[in-house]
């Protein structure tokens, strides 16, 4: 569609109805979705792209209105705030918000919102009503406060926050989530009862909740190259270590030693006694499906248990917790290489003044 040649125009685009999705696409998690209980519209899926139209000083000033069932709350991804401007007799509500871009991302669903003050920020925490019992049992709001207070004090502010506010949005997202412009996504799969009972991530549901939230710093705030599947260096090492430190601060050294360090050590001891670790040729001879299952289990131990032990040893070698905090704060706030923005194991070793051999656990 060609636009008028006037210097300034007001462009209104209306569309509605309930589009039909490919049956296979509709069951895939992540990406654009329109259903009776959840909505995700991204960029051109939300508003057609403007071509050959330069932005003004304030970008592309845009007002977006959307009418949805009254049970659904609208959450723009970013700093924009959506407000209800009309309620219809057919059980729908019209929401409106302003933006400075022609696209953007919009989420909507039957969300519960909790407002939390932590780390010098006002946090809007959104999660699905169907997860309410699980989230309350896990102490989700308390976990958010603990993590944000601790990580902000020890590592620094999240680069994708506005400084004053942050939206944490539970969503159907693939790849662990993403963050920008004062908002961050949390994968709803991380907050199921099954995941929250994973003892490899914490001593209970509340501690697993802490683990998943720490990924806002180690995983989103700082990214890790996951291309080498054999590497024990990943976002999990620093995330598990940070969870241990938070738990140690909350429940004391004895609890943290029993539920974290001792369990890491037991898992690592068992790893090096494992038949397939000692006889890798036998592992390679297995059928692919069985080989992958065993390899994934072994990699889990290395990333979630062995790496935290190495970080703990590094902590002792550099002079204790305060020294390690200074090192991690420096790494978290380092100047990134735009061509390779990942935090590497060598970066960590260099910051500690250590070598790989220094952190051998034998």
Regions found by a protein language model. Give the residues of each.
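Active-site rim elements
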Residues: 48-55, 131-138, 226-229, 294-301, ...
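Extracellular Ig-like/FN3 beta-sandwich strand-entry sites
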Residues: 6-8
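Acidic/His/Gly-enriched intrinsically disordered linker/tail segments
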Residues: 236-309, 317, 336-338
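Amphipathic alpha-helical substructures
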Residues: 133, 254, 300-362
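Surface-exposed helix-capping loop/turn segments at secondary-structure junctions
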Residues: 70-76, 153-164, 222-226, 250-254, ...
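Extended, low-hydrophobicity, Ser/Thr/Pro/Gly-biased non-transmembrane segments
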Residues: 10-110
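Active-site-adjacent structural elements in folded domains
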Residues: 169-171, 199-204, 225, 280-299, ...
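Juxtacatalytic substrate-recognition/specificity segment
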Residues: 64, 115-231, 242
């Amino acid at each position: 569609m060609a636009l008028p040649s006037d210097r300034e125009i007001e462009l209104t685009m209306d569309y509605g109805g309930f589009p039909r999705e490919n049956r296979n696409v509709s069951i895939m998690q992540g990406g654009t979705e329109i259903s009776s209980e959840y909505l995700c519209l991204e960029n051109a899926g939300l508003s057609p792209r403007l071509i050959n139209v330069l932005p003004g000083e304030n970008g592309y000033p845009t007002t977006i209105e959307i009418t949805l069932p009254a049970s659904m709350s609208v959450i723009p991804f970013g700093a924009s705030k959506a407000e209800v401007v009309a309620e219809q007799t057919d059980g729908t509500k019209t929401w409106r918000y302003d933006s400075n871009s022609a696209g953007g991302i919009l989420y909507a669903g039957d969300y519960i919102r909790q407002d939390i003050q932590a780390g010098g920020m006002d946090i809007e925490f959104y999660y699905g009503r169907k997860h309410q019992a699980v989230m309350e049992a896990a102490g989700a709001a308390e976990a958010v406060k603990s993590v944000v207070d601790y990580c902000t004090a020890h590592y620094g502010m999240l680069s994708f926050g506005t400084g004053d506010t942050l939206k944490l949005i539970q969503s159907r997202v693939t790849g662990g989530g993403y963050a920008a412009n004062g908002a961050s996504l949390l994968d709803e799969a991380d907050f199921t009862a099954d995941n929250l009972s994973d003892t490899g991530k914490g001593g209970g549901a509340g501690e697993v909740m802490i683990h998943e939230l720490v990924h806002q710093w180690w995983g989103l705030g700082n990214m890790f190259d996951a291309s080498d599947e054999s590497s024990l260096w990943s976002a999990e090492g620093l995330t598990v270590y940070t969870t241990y430190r938070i738990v140690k601060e909350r429940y004391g050294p004895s609890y943290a030693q029993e539920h974290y360090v001792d369990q890491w050590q037991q898992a690592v001891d068992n790893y090096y006694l494992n038949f397939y670790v000692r006889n890798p040729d036998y592992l390679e001879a297995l059928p692919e499906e069985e080989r992958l299952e065993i390899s994934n289990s072994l990699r889990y131990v290395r990333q979630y248990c062995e790496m935290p032990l190495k970080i703990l040893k590094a902590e002792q070698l550099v002079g204790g917790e305060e020294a390690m905090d200074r090192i991690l704060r420096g790494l978290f706030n380092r100047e990134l290489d735009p061509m390779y923005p990942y935090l590497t194991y060598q970066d960590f070793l260099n910051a500690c003044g250590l070598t790989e051999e220094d952190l051998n656990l034998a």
